[in-house]
């Protein structure tokens, strides 16, 4: 049995105070197993990204705790890599130097960092582009750089906040396949946030469906499908339908409506 890698225990997160107080997450509990690909879906504003930021150490819970290998997360660390939705690249640095940036800050010897970065650049399909600058790259290529940079520290957990959300449909589909290929080679623990049920069902070992704000776990759907997955397969469509069924009412709630009303 796989061990629990990340555990959220009775998490509550609020922003602001008084009349401006917003409860983003309430009574949130979750276990993510080692080497598992876990995907969070839920309505806009339900706290998916907030939870990811707390696992990263960028935000702290108002109450409760998040554990990594049984130890509380209190700050960012090299054991967690983060891929943002936007292409957060340094425009004055080449692909290679974007990937090595964090390693340079950490004091990793230049040649060691370069060798590691070149290996990752090849893995994400950008060999030959190591000397290119971000403005010359397509959106999909930029996000490949972001993935390589997040993996440069060899983190145990990879956190991904809607990384393909701004890509066109065809590029997004290609990137999903490439991400699974990388994950199968490196077997990282992945926590991935998306609005797309299609994407979630294609990628995940386990899908966490969150309620409307304040976010909590509404349901957990195991995706017992071989990879690569067929978007038109009966079992795939059944699982996708199950997730949509859990999600529909929460989306309506987030819009201030109830089922059956217009």
Region annotations inferred by a language model:
Residues 147:
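Hydrophobic anchor residue at the start of the ABC signature
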Residues 158-161:
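Catalytic Walker B motif of ABC-type/P-loop ATPase nucleotide-binding domains
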Residues 41-43:
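The feature captures the beta-strand-to-loop junction immediately N-terminal to the Walker
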Residues 56:
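Helix-to-loop junction immediately C-terminal to a conserved catalytic motif
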Residues 64-76:
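Conserved ABC transporter NBD signature motif
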Residues 93-100:
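Short coil-to-helix segment of the ABC ATPase nucleotide-binding domain corresponding to the Q-loop/switch region
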Residues 100, 104, 111-129, 181:
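Conserved ABC ATPase "signature" region
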Residues 132-135, 153:
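Conserved signature/switch motifs of ABC ATPase nucleotide-binding domains
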């Amino acid at each position: 049995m796989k061990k629990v890698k990340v555990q959220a225990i009775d998490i509550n997160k609020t922003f602001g105070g008084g009349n401006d107080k917003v409860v983003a997450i309430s009574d949130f509990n979750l276990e993510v197993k080692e080497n598992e690909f876990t995907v969070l879906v839920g309505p806009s504003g339900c706290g998916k990204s907030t939870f990811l930021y707390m696992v990263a150490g960028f935000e702290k819970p108002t109450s409760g705790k998040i554990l990594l290998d049984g130890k509380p997360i209190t700050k960012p660390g090299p054991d967690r890599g983060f891929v943002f939705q936007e292409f957060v690249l340094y425009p004055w640095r080449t692909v290679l130097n974007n990937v090595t940036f964090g390693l340079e800050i950490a004091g990793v010897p230049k040649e060691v960092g370069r060798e590691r970065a070149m290996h990752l650049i090849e893995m994400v399909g950008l060999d030959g582009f190591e000397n290119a600058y971000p403005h010359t790259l397509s959106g999909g290529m930029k996000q490949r750089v972001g993935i390589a940079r997040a993996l440069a520290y060899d983190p145990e957990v990879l956190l991904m906040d809607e990384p393909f959300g701004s890509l066109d449909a065809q590029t997004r589909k290609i990137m999903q396949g490439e991400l699974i290929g990388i994950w199968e080679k490196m077997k990282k623990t992945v926590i991935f946030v998306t609005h797309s049920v299609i994407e979630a069902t294609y990628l995940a070992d386990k899908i966490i469906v969150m309620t409307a704000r304040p976010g909590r776990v509404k349901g957990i759907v195991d995706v017992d499908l071989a990879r690569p997955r067929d978007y038109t397969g009966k079992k795939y469509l059944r699982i996708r339908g199950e997730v949509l069924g859990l999600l529909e009412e929460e989306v309506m709630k987030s819009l201030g409506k109830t089922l059956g009303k217009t």
